[in-house]
Amino acid sequence: MKKIVSIILTIFLSSITYAQEERISSTIDSTKSPELVLIQEFKVKAALDAVWNAYTTKKGWESWAVPLAEIDLKVGGIIKTNYNASGKIGDSTTIITHIVNYVPKRLITLQAEITDNFPEFMKEDAKDFYNVIYFDELENGYVNVKSFGIGYKNNTKYLSLMNYFITANEKLLLQLISY
């Protein structure tokens, strides 16, 4: 029965597109394995340098995403962020994201460290979670950003988590679009 429900959800969700605004497209897609991919895509009217810097510099992160950030931009580097303006980098609310690789102004692959602040069910799957982000410079001063959240399992807990991430990410990405 679980397998049938999982198959039905996979088929159903592979065709659903979520969008807070037309400016951000959020899609849950299935892969050949029992995993789901969260694809989020949007366009920003800004120079490629500015959008790349928004993702890869302290000033960039603190301009649109978080009040506190530290960045060590290199393969094997780390992005440390904190959504708590009263907190500090290194406290229990710091989010640590590893930079797996990058191609300047084209692509960055990230992997978040799963801490005690994440749901328990994610901890055993921590090695599977990646975010691959592509940056494409378009005509007329726009940049297309396409993010692939990889490693989500196709079950009820992860579907609920993905719905949370869709809403939270779209709100955050709207801040980047306005930045």
Where are these regions (language model features)?
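A short, structured loop/turn motif at beta-sheet edges
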Residues: K45-D49, L73, V100-I108, Y134-N144, ...
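Hydrophobic/aromatic beta-strand elements that line small-molecule binding cavities or substrate pockets
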Residues: Q40-F42, L68, T94-N101, D128-E137
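Hydrophobic pocket/interface hotspot
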Residues: V51-W52, W61, I79-T81, I99, ...
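Short beta-edge strand/loop motif at the mouth of beta-sheet-based domains
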Residues: K59-T94, Y102
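Hydrophobic ligand-binding cavity/cleft-lining segments
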Residues: Y18-E70
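Bacterial Sec-dependent N-terminal signal peptides
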Residues: M1-I24
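A mature extracytoplasmic/lumenal domain signature
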Residues: L48, Y83-A85, N101-V103, A112-I114, ...
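Beta-strand/loop substructures that line and gate deep hydrophobic ligand-binding cavities in soluble
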Residues: P119-I166
